Amino acid sequence: MRVKICGITNLEDALVAIEAGADALGFVFYEKSPRYIHPQEAKIISKKLPPFVERVGLFVHEEPVKIDEICSYCNMSLAQIHFDVEESFFEKLQTKALPVVRAKCAEDILQFSDRYRLVDAYVPEFGGAGRRVALEWFENIDCSKIVLAGGLSPKNVSEVKRYGFYGVDVSSGVEARKGKKDPQKVREFIQKAKFE
């Protein structure tokens, strides 16, 4: 199962995550988030990362042109679209994109079922809230294109492995405080998600 550590705000946290085995790092380009990072800072961090690490820019209520501009400037390899959009929105993007399904009910997780997508619990504040999607919603469905997010931590990530998710995405579950990761929690989360 692949692992994305989201809400990276500094190089130290990025390197700890990569060393521990993270497949992807998430950078939040949403100014209202406590994990917001200025594109200039993200670019500096991105340049210092080793190859073969996915760099994901998270966006809320941005136009495709602006998303492409920031992703290009910061060397992001993927744009995570963390707001409700139609399929046509993705056609306007030059950057490869991952839609986010903010699920309120079981039917919601079937949105964008023909493509890779991130499924998170619906919360008004757009992520990082630690709210969890009901796992029973994933019974008897193909989860191989789903990245699960929301309410994950080193204590519970092992529970989700049996569903066959493509990956998991964690932010608040591995923090010492908002915007700063706890290295021990990061290592423990990745160990349990990938290697146990």
Curated annotation (Swiss-Prot):
Pathway: Amino-acid biosynthesis; L-tryptophan biosynthesis; L-tryptophan from chorismate: step 3/5. The keyword Amino-acid biosynthesis applies. One of its GO terms (biological process) is L-tryptophan biosynthetic process. Its EC number is 5.3.1.24. CDD domains: PRAI. It comes from the Bacteria. It catalyses: N-(5-phospho-beta-D-ribosyl)anthranilate = 1-(2-carboxyphenylamino)-1-deoxy-D-ribulose 5-phosphate. GO terms for molecular function: phosphoribosylanthranilate isomerase activity. Keywords: Amino-acid biosynthesis, Aromatic amino acid biosynthesis, Isomerase, Tryptophan biosynthesis. Belongs to the TrpF family. This is N-(5'-phosphoribosyl)anthranilate isomerase. The lineage of its organism: Bacteria, Pseudomonadati, Campylobacterota, Epsilonproteobacteria, Nautiliales.
